[in-house]
A protein has these predicted regions:
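Generic beta-sheet signal
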Residues: 10, 58, 148-157
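Alpha-helix C-terminal capping segments
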Residues: 49, 74-79, 140-148, 186-187
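Active-site signature of alpha/beta-hydrolase-fold catalytic machinery across serine-
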Residues: 74, 161, 165
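Phosphate-handling substructures
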Residues: 32-33, 78-138, 176, 188, ...
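Active-site-proximal alpha-helix that buttresses catalytic centers in soluble enzyme cores
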Residues: 5-82, 109, 130
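Short active-site segment of divalent metal-dependent hydrolases/proteases
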Residues: 18, 158-159
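Domain-level recognition of soluble alpha/beta enzyme cores
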Residues: 166-195
Length: 197
């Protein structure tokens, strides 16, 4: 990967909670609307980003998926800047035919293939899903182009991959990173800081 400018600052956020998050359904690249809680999380992220960044105009990169776009629109109410740049490299990995199913349903169909989030290799076994290598390449491509302060609104597995790639973590380490809603990960100077409300 091309070296990242040490002065680059990335404020990485996961979209707010969705109906499918609440229901335990795998989303991948299918969409599900934010819940009332998810909209509140996005509002809180906007306020927190405004406190961290002041009222200076900030560039926002966002996944093209509806839940990320909705989160970015709510954040923009607090953080001024140009229209967000929609970048498909920030979208969630595709989970193929598993999208919309619960983990239990996938296990019933696929003889117990699903593990827990501490052993997330099962994500890359989805029929018609995205491979680890392809997923890693698109994240690397996005990350290598970042040159200034940017807010990135993305997804659970994608935020794991971005942070892991930035830190140079192993495959297992990056797939084990936590992905709560309502936090900001600040990537700068070769480190990642988790910022809570």
């Amino acid at each position: 990967m091309k070296a990242i400018d040490p002065a680059t600052e990335i404020y990485l956020v996961r979209h707010g909670e969705t109906e499918w998050n609440r229901d335990g359904r795998l989303q991948g690249q299918h969409n599900s609307s934010l819940t009332a809680r998810g909209r509140r999380q996005a509002e809180q992220l906007g306020r927190l980003l405004a406190r961290l960044l002041g009222r200076q105009q900030r560039l926002i990169n966002v996944s093209p998926l509806g839940r990320a776009l909705e989160t970015a629109a709510i954040i923009r109410q607090q953080v001024p800047g140009p229209e967000p740049i929609i970048d498909p490299r920030l979208q969630e990995m595709t989970l193929g035919s598993w999208e919309g199913l619960t983990r239990k349903e996938v296990n019933e169909q696929c003889n117990g293939v699903v593990g827990d989030d501490a052993n997330a290799e099962w994500w890359f076994r989805a029929p018609g899903g995205e491979s680890f290598d392809h997923f890693q390449q698109r994240v690397r491509s996005w990350l290598s182009e970042q040159r200034g302060p940017v807010i990135a609104v993305s997804h659970g597995i994608t935020t794991r991959m971005i942070r892991g790639e930035y830190l140079g973590l192993s495959r297992h380490e990056r797939l084990s990173l936590p992905v709560p809603h309502g936090v900001i990960w600040r990537l700068r100077g070769g480190g990642v800081e988790t910022i809570h409300q």
